[in-house]
Amino acid sequence: MLLIPAIDLKDGHCVRLEQGDMDKATVFSEDPGAMAAHWISKGARCLHLVDLNGAFAGKLKNESAIKSILKAVGDEIPVQLGGGIRDLETIERLLDDGISTVIIGTAAVKNPGFVQDACTAFPGHVMVGLDARDGKVATDGWSKITCHKVIDLAKKFEDWGVEAIIYTDIGRDGMLKGVNIDATVKLAQAIRIPVIASGGLSNNQDIDALCKAEEEGVMGVIAGRSIYASDLDLAAAQKYADELTLKYKKKTN
């Protein structure tokens, strides 16, 4: 079970939102590169970046901050990025700059064929982000709720080579209320693509439940406010997850 620190970028700063509300942003650092280095020092094995301004604008808006993070990271760990990725040219540029995996969100909902094109052009470098409120997918920085159900939409991407589905429960994001385990597991059971949980991670009980769900296809979880507010220590939490993974694997063997 991989715990992936999130670095959400707004106006060049590292922030955390509450339920995706841009007016409820807490600034945790004005130096995203330093924040990336901090998480690496804590044992992060991957970083999850979101260009929040880009998600609303439909194009990248925090490229300077993204480049500062990539400079700080170097070749140490992979970096995934979502928010405002709507064309193949942007994907190519990001991969050339050092991003390991791009996350297609709004564009995947509005034009699923774009995901297939991206997977064909950049195999092994594409994930899909599905963000939902009450089971319905949201787009445009979570500002619009669609009629699409998460599982129905996710099934469209099964045969195209998508590396993972990042599933976010908007209602829990930034609220420290616990991961929506039931919805995450149901999604993982319904599709053949690995699932990364997002939204609400708060304590070791969440980690325990997620580790139990690994055999269902849940491969990781995005860690946000819990590690910024020190409710969870990243290094200790990852160690705990590693121990649980071994424990549950032994039980199933």
UniProtKB/Swiss-Prot annotation:
The entry's keywords: Amino-acid biosynthesis, Cytoplasm, Histidine biosynthesis, Isomerase
Domain of life, source organism: Bacteria
Catalytic machinery residues: D8, D131
Keyword Protease recorded: no
Gene Ontology MF terms in the entry: 1-(5-phosphoribosyl)-5-[(5-phosphoribosylamino)methylideneamino]imidazole-4-carboxamide isomerase activity
Record's catalysed reaction(s): 1-(5-phospho-beta-D-ribosyl)-5-[(5-phospho-beta-D-ribosylamino)methylideneamino]imidazole-4-carboxamide = 5-[(5-phospho-1-deoxy-D-ribulos-1-ylimino)methylamino]-1-(5-phospho-beta-D-ribosyl)imidazole-4-carboxamide
Enzyme Commission number(s) from the entry: 5.3.1.16
GO cellular component, one term: cytoplasm
Lipid metabolism as UniProt keyword: no
Main localisation: cytoplasm
Family annotation (Pfam families): His_biosynth (PF00977)
Top enzyme class: isomerase
GO BP: any one term: L-histidine biosynthetic process
Subcellular locations according to the entry: Cytoplasm
UniProt pathway annotation: Amino-acid biosynthesis; L-histidine biosynthesis; L-histidine from 5-phospho-alpha-D-ribose 1-diphosphate: step 4/9
Family: Belongs to the HisA/HisF family.
NCBIfam families the record matches: 1-(5-phosphoribosyl)-5-[(5-phosphoribosylamino)methylideneamino]imidazole-4-carboxamide isomerase, PRK13585.1
Name under which the protein is recorded: 1-(5-phosphoribosyl)-5-[(5-phosphoribosylamino)methylideneamino] imidazole-4-carboxamide isomerase
Organism whose genome encodes this protein: Polynucleobacter necessarius subsp. necessarius (strain STIR1)
